[in-house]
Structure formats: structure tokens, C-alpha cells
Amino acid sequence: MVVGQRSSVTDRLLLKAKKMHTLKKYVLALHTQATTLFDDLRAGSVDAVNRGVTRDTYGKGEQFGHELVEKHARTLGLEIRHDHMRNTYMVLPGLDRNAPAIVIGSHLDSVLGGGNFDGAAGVMAGLIAVQAMQRAGHKLNCDVVVMGIRAEESIWFQVSYVGSRGALGTLPASALQQRRIDTGRTLEQHMREADAEPEAVAKGVAYLSPKNVKAFLELHIEQAPSLALTGYALAIGTGVPGHFRFPRVKITGEYGHVGLGRRFRHDAALAGADLSVGLDALWQQWEAEGRLMACTFGEFQTNPARHGMTIVPGEFQFSLDVRAYDDADVAELEQALMTIVGQIEQKRGVKFDFGVRASSKVAKADPIITQQLRDCAQRLSMTVCDLPSPASHDSAAFCAAGIPFGFVFIRNPNGSHHPDEEMSIDDFLQGTAVLTEWLATHG
């Protein structure tokens, strides 16, 4: 090659780099569209009673979210599909319609009185990425599928990843008989009201699989203030914790008179308090050792039908979620829990009934996709860090089904699952630009 003459390979690389930066400009130019999408979503699901928004799983709130994104997708000319769970798929056709697709998305339901961005940001990111590629005239080899997922928030039916596991054929049929906490009606009943097909769940029908999905990409707000405190706008997610859950644990002691001596008591409330203190002490010990875990007592109460100021509590009920980032650690924590429980039962003269157990394995982000996302951010002059997710996400269901996933976090200084959840549109578009470059490079 003549000195000073560029090779055709170099020219192609330079052209590709130029296209990538052009795509970023197209993403950033969609600020108004992104703002409008989030504003419209909030307006249609605002909860005046509980503050924040409520997009109830298989209810009017979640349904509004799906109708909103589907309407927007139609304006972009995307193909619209639904599976037996009534998940929404908005498809940008690729050059090879038979190639495994890239799915990008998240859930559209929320907790009661939650924030507007948890889950929804991942769906909106997919729509903005697709629109940017359309405007840039960028064609991908495979289909890009923006997925609005149903029923991720387990608070409603006490079951994890209902929509995604249903689509993947991994949701157990027993989940159909779980009752929604507010209506008392079963998941099966709610699904039928949404024109879903619960009988397909019972048959284990898989709409998505490693055969037709190349990868799953999820953008999500961080659900802790870590990024805000460290000055990062974005992070690349490295994994989703595994957990075990007991939605309804009951401690049975013995009701007694308020004047009863300590040695005669079988106080169920103090037994619950002992367990909370014991697990918190274990958590402090793990933190001191540099080991990551978390435990949460979401419900924690005596029986309101029988408790009173002058009565020793004979019943106590709580929910428990314990999580960690290694399956061996999760198993160790459950063993430690049962050891503590045995000590409390002997000390207080009470009995624990843990009821139904739910669990999920640790899901590690695909290392190749993770590095590719880091590289995309670097090429776009964005500074990112790695961050393990403190929360559970639909990505874990895809991972368990054998589909690799990648994850991008957006900073959120106020945490999540409450009305003050926060995300700037500028940060959102930066994260979406990273996903868009990944799609353009690897799609």
C-alpha cells in the first residue's frame, strides 16, 4: 500500500463510525417525542389516591400502557403482535426475516402508587431506538422487536416475571390460581379479561425461545441512588440477583393477658422482631465481609382482627424476600434463616409456618454483550461503570430460558417503587443511544 493511502478496510471502519455518531444524533433529536411518551403514560395512569402512578397487572392501568405504546408503534409503521399472555410486540422488520430477532423491552405495569419510569423506560427506549434507525435509514439484518411485557411486578399476584415467563413457556400452571391481592380474583380470570389465553400457560406454550430470539436488551432506571451518588449517568448491568421469597409467613404463639410474666409468654410479635433483628445482623456481617445480599420484610403485622393494647400477640404475619448475587450465597442465606428460626422457636415457644416458597436463580448478563455495551458507550464518549442490579428484572427470565441478555441502567437519585422516582430525559436518551449503537453494530 502506498504511504498515505488508506485501505478500503480503514474507509469502511471510518464510515461505520460516522454512521454510529449519526445514529446518536438521531436519538438525541427525539427529546420531545420521548418526553411526550412519558408524559402521556403518566397522565393515563396517575393515581390520585396513592400519589404517583398505578398500572395494575392485568388491569386498567397496565392495559392503558400497552394501548399507548401500541398506538405510537403504529405511527412508526411497526408490525404489531400479541402472544397468549397479551404481551405487546412492536416489530421493525430486518433484511432476513428468518434470522433470530433481537428483543428490546421491559414491563409496563407498576406497583401501587409507584413511579412512572420503572419498567416503562425500557419499552420507550426500544421505540426511540427504532425511530432513530428509521430516520437514519439504517437497516438491520434481523428483526428488532420492542416488547411491552405484562405482569413483572410480583406484588399483585405474588408471582415473579408472569408475562416474560409465560412468553418463554416457563411459567408454572399453578401460577394461574394465584389471586390478585386487591381483587381476590385469580390470574387466570384476569388474563381472560385481557383477552389472554391462560390455557396456553397450562400447556407450556413458548412464544419466545433461543431459536427465535438472538438476545434480550433491557434498559431500566436504577432502583437505588448509587449512580447519582457516584456521578455516573449510566451503568452497564452485570447481573440480576437470585432470591427466595415467602409471601405469607405465619408465626403462631399464644394469646395472653398483658400482665403475663415474661417466662409464661409465647409472644408471636416478639418472635417476628427477633427474626428481623437477626437477619439484619447477618446482613451487617456480610457487608463487613464485602459480600452482597439484601433482605426485606415487606409486610410485618399482628392479626388486626384480634390484636389489642392489652393482649399478648398470639399470631404474627410477614412476607420475606432474601437475595444475593451467587446461587451458593442464596442457599447459604436460606440455611442461615432456618437456623435463626429454630433458635427463635425454642426461645419464644412459637412455631413458624413459611407457606408457599418462590425463588429465582442468579442471572448473569452475557459477558460478550456486556463488553460490547461498554465499547459502544466508549465510542460515544460516554463514561459508564459496571453495576449489579439490586432488583429483579425480566432479563432473569430470559437468561433462565437460555437467551443471553444485556442491561443498561439510568441514574435515579430517589430510588424506586414510590412516587418520587426520577429520571432525566437527557440521561434516558444517552442510555438509549448506547442501545441503538449496539443494535446497529450487532443486529
Region spans (language model):
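N-terminal capping segment at the start of a domain
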Residues: 17, 21-59, 176, 416-418
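His/Asp/Glu-rich mid-to-C-terminal helical/loop segments that flank catalytic regions of hydrolases
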Residues: 26, 257-286, 334-339, 384, ...
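Zn-dependent metallopeptidase/amidohydrolase metal-coordination segment
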Residues: 33-40, 105-106, 384-437
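A non-catalytic alpha/beta surface segment that caps or lines the substrate-entry region
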Residues: 46-93
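A short beta-alpha structural unit
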Residues: 54-58, 294-305, 324-325, 351-370, ...
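Catalytic-core environment of secreted peptidases
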Residues: 72, 76, 88-121, 126, ...
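Alpha-helical metal-binding/catalytic segments enriched in His/Glu/Asp
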Residues: 104, 113-152, 245-251, 260-283, ...
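Midchain, well-structured core segments that form catalytic/ion-binding scaffolds
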Residues: 152-153, 158-327
